[in-house]
């Protein structure tokens, strides 16, 4: 029964901003994940200008017992962070914690459901 012992963590990764209010939508996504699954282990992390960073967020989940961590990049487009920085950071996490199963979701902007939702919002009159 290995599955019962497995603790899965989710890191919602966003760009980051010095403006504290900028984080509110990211934190709202985390709150929604928890509403849908109160047992979820979800944290927010930021590429720059805000804390925690990805390494610190992963370290916190691992300290809490996570054996698998899924990183969900909350980016609309495949910019430099998603294309270059994130793969390097994920590689560093895998090297720092080889016992943890890290996975990377595709950027949310590539998810058909989000594209459809944004189109519906844009088309509202």
Tell me what each language-model feature is:
Residues 1-125:
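Active-site-proximal alpha-helix that buttresses catalytic centers in soluble enzyme cores
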């Amino acid at each position: 029964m290995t599955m019962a012992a497995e603790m899965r963590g989710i890191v919602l990764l966003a760009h980051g901003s010095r403006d504290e209010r900028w984080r509110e939508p990211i934190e709202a996504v985390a709150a929604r994940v928890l509403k849908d699954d109160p047992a979820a282990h979800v944290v927010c992390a930021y590429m720059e200008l805000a804390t925690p960073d990805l390494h610190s967020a992963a370290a916190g989940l691992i300290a809490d017992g996570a054996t698998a961590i899924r990183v969900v990049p909350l980016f609309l487009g495949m910019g430099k962070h998603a294309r270059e920085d994130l793969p390097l950071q994920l590689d560093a996490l895998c090297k720092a914690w080889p016992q943890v199963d890290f996975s990377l979701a595709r950027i949310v902007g590539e998810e058909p459901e989000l594209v459809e939702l944004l189109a519906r919002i844009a088309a509202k009159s």
